[in-house]
Amino acid sequence: MIYQKQRNTAETQLNISISDDQSPSHINTGVGFLNHMLTLFTFHSGLSLNIEAQGDIDVDDHHVTEDIGIVIGQLLLEMIKDKKHFVRYGTMYISMDETLARVVVDISGRPYLSFNATLSKEKVGTFDTELVEEFFRAVVINARLTTHIDLIRGGNTHHEIEAIFKAFSRALGIALTATDDQRVPSSKGVIE
């Protein structure tokens, strides 16, 4: 199933769709490094993304990065509500040369982000690295996920961010995996 949403503000104009059919993705955020990270997201999560974004990137990349995170989170929440039987929890460690990242995802209905990652530099190219946390906070809050992101070791900032994106994507993919269990994956009987 394809989930689609548009978001138009004074700062950004977004048209985003997400699906779990592994169809080809098309990502155009206007921010090269973010395009790269979201391409990794699609590959490692098993989800397809189509993104057409315009924003005030002449100011900086903040609004487009955060707003894309908001919409991806909202679309994930719609997808999760349609899925009744899924693993719920996902954990992944990803190494990238000198870097090691760990991400734990719980599709809990309780939005929380622990972002424990001190990135080595403030920029990768022109991309402000502080936007990595802003992106994940927007996704996690809007998808209502509990997520712990830990950068255990680092060195190269590009590797650090890439390992975090890959670990999140893999952990989310595991958590979304369908099961044959007919019960809601919560002892409460509900995930809201």
From Swiss-Prot:
Tree of life domain: Bacteria
Species, as recorded: Staphylococcus aureus (strain MRSA252)
Protein name as it appears in the record: Imidazoleglycerol-phosphate dehydratase
GO biological process: L-histidine biosynthetic process
Family the entry assigns: Belongs to the imidazoleglycerol-phosphate dehydratase family.
InterPro entries membership: IGPD_sf, ImidazoleglycerolP_deHydtase, ImidazoleglycerP_deHydtase_CS, Ribosomal_Su5_D2-typ_SF
GO cellular component entries: cytoplasm
HAMAP family: HisB
